[in-house]
């Protein structure tokens, strides 16, 4: 398991190549970047004291949310749910065999599952009929 998402791509440098070479799958955790890639938050957002993001550095949070706005404007297809896009983005890397998103509602579970429709048939984890 490694932290991997559109905002944190460090595993692409050494971890993923090593896993591919050894034929090991990668479980990408925190694929929505603690909710920043959900599309729900804009720069200037604040979080409740009981929210783990409340303890994040305010300047880093602002920078992350500004980057999310750039990603939404330039990378996410119009009309596509940002969270689904972020999960599919992780799954499109050949090293990633599974993402581990969190969810707080049945709707989020459905949205998380819907991301699979954006992963191509040629992905090594794509469902194959026998």
Region spans (language model):
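Beta/alpha (TIM)-barrel catalytic core signal, keyed to glycine-rich beta->alpha loops juxtaposed to Asp/Glu
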Residues: 1-129
């Amino acid at each position: 398991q490694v932290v991997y998402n559109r905002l944190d791509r460090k595993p692409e440098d050494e971890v993923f190549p090593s896993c591919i070479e050894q034929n090991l799958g990668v479980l990408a955790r925190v694929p929505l970047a603690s909710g920043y890639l959900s599309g729900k938050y804009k720069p200037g957002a604040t979080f409740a004291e009981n929210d783990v993001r409340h303890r994040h550095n305010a300047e880093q949070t602002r920078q992350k949310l500004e980057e999310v706005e750039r990603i939404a404007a330039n990378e996410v297809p119009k009309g596509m749910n940002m969270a689904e896009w972020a999960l599919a983005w992780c799954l499109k890397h050949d090293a990633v065999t599974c993402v581990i998103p969190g969810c707080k509602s049945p709707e989020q579970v459905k949205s998380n599952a819907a991301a699979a429709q954006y992963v191509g048939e040629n992905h090594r984890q794509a469902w194959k009929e026998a």
